[in-house]
Each structure stands twice: as C-alpha cells, then as structure tokens.
Regions:
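Bacterial N-terminal signal peptides that target proteins for export
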Residues: 1-10
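Acidic, serine/threonine-rich low-complexity disordered tracts
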Residues: 24-91, 95-100, 106-107, 135-227
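Mid-length scaffold segments of soluble, non-membrane domains
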Residues: 116-145
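Bacterial N-terminal signal peptides
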Residues: 9-19
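Short alpha-helix capping/helix-loop boundary micro-motifs
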Residues: 111-114
Length: 227
C-alpha cells in the first residue's frame, strides 16, 4: 500500500533521524512541556533519506505558520507529505490533516488527533482516537475511511550518539495504528528531542495486515544534513 510507506517516511522525518542509536538512558524526568521539545517557529532544515526506496536523496523539512489563527502550523517534507498542526485550548499539539503527495491522497482526522499532550506526564499511556477519511488529492474522491489510535507509551531522558556528537535529550516510544476495512496499518516510532531545539533522533517501521493474515513490513529513515 503506497500510502503506508508515505506515512512512515513522513512520520520518521517529522521526528528527524540523526542516524545513530540512543546509547544511554538517564534518570527519568517528566516536568517538561511539549513546546520545550517541539518549538513552534518558522524554520527549514535539510535531510538525507538513509533507508528505504529513496535512500540517499536530499529533502527539505520545513515548519511555517499556516496563516489564520496564530496556533496553526504546517510541516512539509519536500514533495512527500505535509502535516497540518494546531494547539488546542489545553496546549496539546493536534494533527487535523495529513497530505500524502506521493500517493496523491490526503487524510482528514475527525476530530483533530492529539499527538502530544501539553506536558509529558499527562500523555503517557493514554490512547487517543479519531476517525479519519482519505481522499484523492486531485479529485476529492473519498478513497478510504477508518479509525486511528495513537499512544505515547514511554519516555526517558537519553543520550544519543549522532554524527554531530553526543546529544542529551528525551526519547519517546510511540504506537500508531490505523484500522480500515479489510486492512490494518501499525506503526512503531521512536522519537528523540533536544530541549529548545526540537527533534534530533527518530526511527520507525510499519506493518500492513490485509484480510487478517497477509502482512508486509517496511522501515524508513532520514538524517539531518544542515539547518
């Protein structure tokens, strides 16, 4: 399923690989807000795809204000995908639309799906759910409907070994599942963020199950080149 690979590539790059494993777990600390780990400001970075179909390709990743309400933002990964983000009244970071350019589709979440709680502690182990509809990007034709479940499973302070050297930050384990008629897409994501700088590490894989028993598993990765 083409959109499965597109979602995974974008999810990994959303949380930005610096190509290397987290090496040490430090003492846990949860007294931190999402705005400290994912600063909302206009920026652009360059990434290299390090795993998957387009391995070696350079792709820009940019975050910019989407206009209208001050809390509405758009995160774009080259010509692969774009995600529409906003804050709710409690300060959580929400996703209400995902554009998948390569698969000529876009997904609308109803209601908007919380992907990060305002503070780390309140979001752990809580399953967030929303309905979704997938449309053709050019014609607007409805292609699929389903339900998504998103959970932040664990978080720990960690030290990441990267080409830029050792970086201290926070490591998140995330579970994301999309249930559709006759199919299920399950994504396991690892996310590393540095305070006041945003994502510095990421890893992910997806497993697509069709008709309950046909399965396909793939991975994707991308690494920071420049800011």
């Amino acid at each position: 399923m083409a959109f499965g690979r597109s979602i995974l590539v974008f999810a990994v790059v959303l949380w930005t690989i610096l190509f290397g494993p987290a090496t040490w777990a430090l003492a846990p600390s949860y007294d931190i807000a999402v705005r400290d780990l994912f600063p909302l400001a206009d920026w652009q970075k360059q990434f290299r795809i390090t795993d998957g179909k387009d391995r070696g390709k350079l792709v820009p990743l940019s975050l910019h204000h989407a206009g209208g309400a001050q809390e509405t933002w758009r995160l774009d990964f080259g010509d692969y995908a774009g995600i529409h983000l906003k804050n709710d009244v409690n300060g959580s970071l929400m996703m209400d639309r995902l554009d998948l350019t390569k698969s000529h589709s876009f997904i609308v979440y109803e209601p908007a799906l919380p992907i990060f709680a305002r503070d780390v502690r309140s979001g752990l182990g809580v399953a967030r759910q929303a309905n979704f509809k997938m449309y053709d990007l050019e014609t607007g034709r409805l292609k699929r409907v389903g339900r998504v479940t998103h959970m932040m499973k664990r978080v720990s302070r960690s030290r990441f070994e990267t080409p830029a050297g050792l970086i201290d930050g926070y490591y998140f384990e995330i579970d994301h599942r999309m249930d559709m008629q006759y199919a299920q897409l399950h994504m396991s994501l690892g996310l590393g963020c540095r305070l006041d700088d945003g994502p510095v590490y990421g890893a992910g894989r997806y497993t697509l199950t069709k008709l309950g028993f046909f399965t396909e598993t793939k991975t994707a990765a991308a690494g920071l080149v420049s800011r």
